[in-house]
């Protein structure tokens, strides 16, 4: 940067040139924020885990952080039987697996068409996708519910499956952004070698979208697994995880130790999903593409 210049040029400045004391301070602040965030997340989980092993009397008369005198495993058995948690887990896993698979297939296909084919209304369709994602979901529920009723899908698995697969606008947006970084020359080379567009999609595009698929998979899994409104409204006679936990809290004499046990049971699949997918998300987030 010129000595005669009165303006600050970011190109001539780097974090390494800051005083050592300032670097140490900001590094320490980052770790302090991370520790505080971890504590805020972990403390509620610890209290729920401890409470799930207490008796009802012990839970009401002791501190949330005091360990139980004996492990009340019966709370977990009661959560499975009284709250129909096992039924809810089975229904939820079925809905999640089918919905995630459908979202990935329809999302990648839609993104492939919108990003690769310069049709007349491509930009308009993208704008409509973005605009609809900004609308509050609750504002469309009356018309959506009427459509579901006319299709005869109330109290069936078809209603949540149709809604989860057909309204995944965020997944389409993520796939389009990843496709922007994949060279079109790969498609052209494959077509010159005799590949059809479905073969290009299946053999080239889909494998290169693995980082985006992993990200969407985790997002959709958590969103669908935790959703209460859709299954409660469209399939009230079938239990999922969220509605099964609600059943444990109904009535005048709620056993919160059993509720805590149900919460821990329902957390386990989400935890397993994240731990199994985090390596793929973090290590492959910016890989797998050729830029022009």
Label every model-predicted segment.
Residues 4-11, 19-22, 26-292:
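A structural signal for multi-pass alpha-helical bundles of membrane permease subunits
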């Amino acid at each position: 940067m010129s000595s005669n210049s009165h303006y600050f040029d970011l190109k001539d400045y780097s974090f390494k040139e800051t005083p050592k004391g300032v670097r140490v301070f900001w590094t320490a602040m980052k770790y302090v924020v991370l520790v505080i965030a971890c504590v805020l997340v972990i403390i509620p989980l610890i209290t729920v885990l401890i409470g799930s092993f207490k008796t009802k009397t012990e839970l009401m008369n002791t501190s949330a952080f005091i360990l139980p005198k004996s492990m009340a495993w019966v709370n977990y058995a009661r959560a499975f039987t009284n709250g129909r948690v096992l039924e809810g887990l089975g229904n939820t896993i079925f809905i999640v697996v089918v919905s995630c698979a459908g979202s990935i297939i329809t999302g990648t296909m839609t993104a492939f068409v919108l990003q690769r084919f310069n049709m007349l209304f491509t930009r308009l369709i993208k704008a409509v996708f973005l605009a609809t994602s900004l609308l509050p979901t609750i504002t469309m529920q009356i018309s959506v519910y009427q459509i579901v009723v006319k299709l005869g899908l109330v109290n069936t698995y078809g209603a949540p499956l149709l809604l989860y697969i057909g309204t995944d606008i965020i997944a389409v947006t993520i796939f389009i952004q990843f496709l922007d970084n994949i060279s079109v020359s790969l498609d052209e080379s494959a077509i010159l070698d005799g590949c059809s567009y479905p073969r290009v999609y299946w053999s080239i595009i889909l494998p290169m979208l693995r980082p985006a698929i992993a990200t969407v998979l985790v997002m959709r899994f958590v969103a669908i697994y935790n959703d209460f409104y859709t299954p409660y409204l469209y399939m009230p006679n079938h239990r999922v995880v969220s509605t099964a936990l609600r059943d444990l809290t109904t009535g005048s004499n709620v056993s919160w130790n059993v509720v805590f046990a149900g919460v821990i049971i329902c957390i386990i699949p989400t935890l397993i999903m994240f731990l199994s997918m985090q390596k793929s998300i973090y290590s492959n987030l910016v890989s797998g593409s050729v830029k022009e």
